[in-house]
């Protein structure tokens, strides 16, 4: 049986936490003397009331969550956070349409960064701060935050972590996962704070620095400017953000190794080497192409290509140039990068590099099997044999990922959306990327899409952020059977 009471209680606790975030954003509104503080107070009152009710209704539940409970909790938590998180946008009239308000909030909490706003600079500071905060909270995971504080309430967070996490196959979940989660949040917060300081040194004011730091470490890509990072026209800011986007694309368990000075173990990691090599490879190709086919000089070609490759590789979605003005062959390369993603166990979306490593090794072994039919060729990563069941899961995930992309592109096309735009929107959403192709590229918003398309893309953002199986399991009859 699903532990309904405990799940309800945890959702209530999360809503109370979301209320405190609303109050923080209202403080920003008051600081700037803008009227959006009322929207946060109203949203906070509604959210707190529902949260307290759920906490009361959830008393007396079994505090030990099963794995099945974890899957339900993760999906429901994300949807609940989005439904209540959209209230400041909707109540304040800043996004008066429910579909658009839900889309914008889901885009934030899934760290996608696709926006329907056509006038970002016209929004009040509190609303922009909340918009930026959604991707920072969603980046590492509402549930990662949950399991760090669940032990305080006597609830085990282990099964929640197993459901939400996209840790790589060779990583083991620590038995005291709450401690691990707190360490990861400490690193996450420290990286964010350091980036704020560096951006301020580059000329950004404190507000824009915090918002862009949230967007960078959360790999969300929401900017406070319609032109994104290109607005600042600053090589310093572009290089700094590039470095921190790359860092945020690294598995956080590897960053903990760095903090603990276990450099050899960190830099020998197969996934990290693949990630770094991929960034170097694509940056080189695109930089050389831009140098010979555009008016850019050598440094600018390198900087623009490095920034865009890392931005799309980490599913951040910031832009310093409209890549739709680049040669069409580069659109294909950028689309491949969108699908690949960065490291598992990071704030990024996409297939993840660890799956690419496994697919590469499986393909290589199959070629060898043709030459040596009787050879036993296990897949090894970091000198450890990957279990056949894990390989099967990776293959199934990739097949399902591609199938959903193809089916969604066909659905989008059936709605009258251009084929290039359909491809860009679908891949961008399921990979939690942000900008797409064509009329949904980095220079445009997604406001012109029909409502049905926005609901479909919101669903793709959710399943992409939660690694497909977490959500899709809920639609299988077997999941709900008692045994």
Task: Describe these PLM feature segments.
Residues 1-483:
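Membrane-proximal intracellular helices of multi-pass ion channels
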């Amino acid at each position: 049986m699903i532990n309904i009471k405990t799940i309800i209680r945890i959702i209530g606790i999360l809503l109370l936490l979301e209320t405190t975030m609303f109050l923080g954003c209202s403080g920003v509104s008051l600081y700037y003397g803008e009227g959006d503080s009322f929207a946060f107070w109203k949203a906070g009152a509604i959210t707190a009331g529902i949260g307290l009710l759920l906490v009361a209704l959830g008393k007396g539940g079994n505090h030990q969550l099963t794995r099945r409970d974890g899957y339900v909790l993760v999906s429901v938590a994300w949807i609940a956070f989005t439904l209540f998180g959209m209230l400041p946008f909707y109540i304040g009239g800043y996004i008066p349409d429910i579909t658009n308000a839900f889309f914008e909030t889901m885009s934030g909490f899934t760290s996608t960064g696709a926006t329907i706003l056509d006038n970002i600079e016209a929004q009040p500071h509190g609303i922009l701060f909340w918009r930026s905060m959604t991707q920072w909270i969603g980046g590492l995971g509402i549930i990662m935050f949950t399991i760090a504080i669940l032990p305080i309430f006597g609830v085990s967070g282990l099964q929640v972590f197993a459901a939400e996490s996209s840790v790589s196959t060779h990583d083991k979940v620590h038995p005291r996962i709450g401690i691990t989660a707190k360490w990861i949040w400490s690193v996450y917060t420290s990286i964010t704070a350091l980036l704020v300081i560096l951006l301020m040194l580059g000329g950004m004011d404190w507000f824009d620095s915090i918002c862009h730091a949230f967007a960078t470490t959360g790999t969300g890509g929401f900017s406070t400017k319609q032109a994104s990072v290109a607005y600042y026209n600053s090589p310093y800011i572009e290089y700094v953000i590039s470095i921190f986007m790359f860092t945020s694309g690294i598995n956080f368990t590897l960053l903990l190794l760095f903090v603990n000075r276990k450099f050899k173990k960190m830099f020998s990691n197969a996934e990290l080497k693949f990630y770094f090599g991929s960034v170097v490879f694509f940056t080189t190709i695109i930089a050389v192409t831009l140098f010979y086919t555009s008016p850019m000089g050598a440094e600018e070609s390198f900087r623009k290509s490095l920034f865009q490759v890392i931005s799309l590789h980490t599913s951040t979605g910031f832009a310093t140039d409209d890549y739709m003005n680049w040669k069409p062959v580069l659109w294909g390369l950028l689309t491949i990068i969108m699908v690949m993603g960065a490291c598992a166990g990071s704030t990024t979306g996409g297939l993840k590099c660890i799956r690419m490593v496994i697919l590469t090794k499986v393909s290589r072994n199959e070629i060898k099997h043709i030459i040596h039919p009787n050879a036993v060729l296990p897949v090894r990563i970091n000198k450890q044999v990957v279990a056949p069941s894990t390989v099967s899961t990776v293959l199934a995930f990739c097949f399902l990922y591609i199938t959903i992309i193809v089916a969604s592109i066909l659905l989008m096309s059936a709605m009258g959306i251009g084929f290039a735009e359909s491809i860009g929107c679908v891949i961008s959403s399921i990979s939690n990327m942000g900008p797409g192709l064509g009329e949904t590229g980095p220079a445009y918003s997604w406001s012109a899409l029909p409502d049905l398309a926005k609901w479909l893309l919101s669903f793709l953002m959710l399943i992409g952020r939660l690694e497909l199986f977490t959500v899709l399991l809920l639609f299988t009859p077997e999941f709900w059977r008692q045994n």
